[in-house]
Amino acid sequence: MNYLEGVGSKKGGGGIASESQFNLQRRKEVESLLSKGENVPYTFQDEKDDQVRSNPYIYKNHSGKLVCKLCNTMHMSWSSVERHLGGKKHGLNVLRRGISIEKSSLGREGQTTHDFRQQQKIIEAKQSLKNNGTIPVCKIATVKNPKNGSVGLAIQVNYSSEVKENSVDSDDKAKVPPLIRIVSGLELSDTKQKGKKFLVIAYEPFENIAIELPPNEILFSENNDMDNNNDGVDELNKKCTFWDAISKLYYVQFFFKQAEQEQADV
């Protein structure tokens, strides 16, 4: 330790260190031991790509104080940094950062592959199912939106009845939810049904259910009481259906655009 420039020192002789100088030197030594001699860069410095650091989120700001870029915290000493690195907040942020990087590395191509495989599983499960001839219990009620007076339908289908053996061979097949589809009369072979429209509810291995609908356009935005079905194959299934896999109850609800609304749109 050099005390030549201390108070009361003489040229050529060891000076007397003041208490403040001694404390400053001791803090520097402690900081060096805690940081293991690592050179902490400033936030405005460009890091080298080949530089490997044990604490890559710790930097010095313009005033020389230690900061954690990940958690946006400032620390007066390296001992405070050590406590922060071992704390819950920094650990959670590192975990979130890792998950974010993993998702971004998956990319759009990886997500598309995952969705394709999921659809293939559903198709294979449906192909292996066989119709058992069971007609589920269906309840239909007319509902009215108190906000604008729109009239709609609320449908409950009970799929909790027993099915024949070997109709469902695995849990993966049971996870395939029911679905709905609007079928126009033009798609039917019966010429008497050409001007009609039907709602078809399908859930293998049960029989399909067909419900005749009025010609009015369906409103998706009015279906506020129904939780979104994220497993739905399209907008109709996502916004107008709810599948309770535990009770095996399937709910469908939507409203129709009234004549006044259709004229206003025109």
Swiss-Prot record:
**SMART domains assigned to the protein according to its UniProt record, in alphabetical order:** ZnF_U1
Query: Which Gene Ontology MF annotations are present?
Result: RNA binding; zinc ion binding
Q: Where is this region: Disordered?
A: 1-21
Q: Where in the cell is it found?
A: Nucleus
Give the main localization category. Answer: nucleus
Please tell me whether the keyword Nucleus is annotated for this protein.
yes
Write down a Pfam family by its short name. Answer: zf-met
- Entry annotated with the keyword Iron-sulfur: no
What keyword terms does UniProt attach to this protein? Metal-binding, mRNA processing, mRNA splicing, Nucleus, Spliceosome, Zinc, Zinc-finger
Zn-finger segments (Matrin-type) = 66-96
> Which SUPFAM superfamilies has this protein been placed in?
beta-beta-alpha zinc fingers
Gene Ontology biological process terms, A to Z: mRNA splicing, via spliceosome; spliceosomal complex assembly; U2-type prespliceosome assembly
Q: How does it assemble?
A: Belongs to the CWC complex (or CEF1-associated complex), a spliceosome sub-complex reminiscent of a late-stage spliceosome composed of the U2, U5 and U6 snRNAs and at least BUD13, BUD31, BRR2, CDC40, CEF1, CLF1, CUS1, CWC2, CWC15, CWC21, CWC22, CWC23, CWC24, CWC25, CWC27, ECM2, HSH155, IST3, ISY1, LEA1, MSL1, NTC20, PRP8, PRP9, PRP11, PRP19, PRP21, PRP22, PRP45, PRP46, SLU7, SMB1, SMD1, SMD2, SMD3, SMX2, SMX3, SNT309, SNU114, SPP2, SYF1, SYF2, RSE1 and YJU2. Interacts with CUS2.
Report the function annotation for this chain.
mRNA splicing factors, PRP9, PRP11, and PRP21, are necessary for addition of the U2 snRNP to the pre-mRNA in an early step of spliceosome assembly.
Return the similarity comment.
Belongs to the SF3A2 family.
Q: What else is known?
A: Present with 3460 molecules/cell in log phase SD medium.
Instruction: List the protein's name.
Output: Pre-mRNA-splicing factor PRP11
Q: What does the organism's lineage look like at the top?
A: Eukaryota, Fungi, Dikarya, Ascomycota, Saccharomycotina
